[in-house]
From Swiss-Prot:
GO terms for cellular component: plastid; small ribosomal subunit. The keyword Cytoplasm does not apply. This is Small ribosomal subunit protein uS7c. The keyword Membrane does not apply. The lineage of its organism: Eukaryota, Viridiplantae, Chlorophyta, core chlorophytes, Trebouxiophyceae.
C-alpha cells in the first residue's frame, strides 16, 4: 500500500477550436517532446479530413470511435502462491477512455509511410465503423479476460 495521498484528478480544459475536452486528451497523447502546436495541427488536420471523407460532424465520429474502442474489462497480473494469474477486472470510465486513445495512437504509429494526420483520420474512421487495429486490440483484451474468468475471484 502506498503511504501517500491519492493524487487529485486534474481538470482537462477543452481545446481552443472545438471546445471539446476529449479532443484535448487526444492532443496531449499525440504530443511528442513538448511540441503541442504540432499535435494541435495534426489533430485539426485530421478533423478536417474526417469531415471531408465522411460528410459527418468530426466530433461525432471521434466520440463514436473512442466509445467503440473503450474496453469494459481488462486483465491484470496477480501473484498467488508461486504462480501468476491474469485476473479480469472492470475498467473505470476514465481509464477506459485513456486506453482507447492510447490504442488508437499506437495503431497509427505502427503504420509507416503516410503523414500522421492521415493515419489518425483512417484509424478514427475505422474505429467508428467497428474495424481496424484498435478494435482488434480491444477484442483481444476482452477474449483474454473471458478466458481467465475462473480467476475473477482473485481480486486485488
Amino acid at each position: 500500500m502506498s503511504r501517500r495521498r491519492t493524487a487529485k484528478k486534474r481538470i482537462v480544459m477543452p481545446d481552443p477550436v472545438y471546445k471539446n475536452s476529449l479532443l484535448e486528451l487526444i492532443v496531449r497523447q499525440v504530443m511528442r517532446n513538448g511540441k503541442k502546436l504540432l499535435a494541435y495541427r495534426i489533430m485539426y488536420n485530421s478533423m478536417i479530413k474526417i469531415a471531408e471523407m465522411t460528410q459527418k460532424d468530426p466530433l461525432d465520429v471521434l466520440e463514436k470511435a473512442i466509445r467503440n474502442v473503450t474496453p469494459l474489462i481488462e486483465v491484470k497480473a496477480r501473484r498467488v502462491g508461486g504462480s501468476t494469474y491474469q485476473v479480469p477486472l472492470e475498467v473505470l470510465p476514465e481509464r477506459g477512455t485513456t486506453l482507447a486513445i492510447r490504442w488508437i495512437l499506437a495503431a497509427c504509429r505502427k503504420n509507416r509511410g503516410k503523414p500522421m494526420y492521415i493515419k489518425l483520420t483512417n484509424e478514427l474512421i475505422d474505429a467508428s465503423n467497428k474495424s481496424g487495429s484498435a478494435i482488434k486490440k480491444k477484442d483481444e483484451i476482452h477474449r483474454m479476460a473471458e478466458a481467465n474468468k475462473a480467476f475473477a475471484k482473485q481480486r486485488f
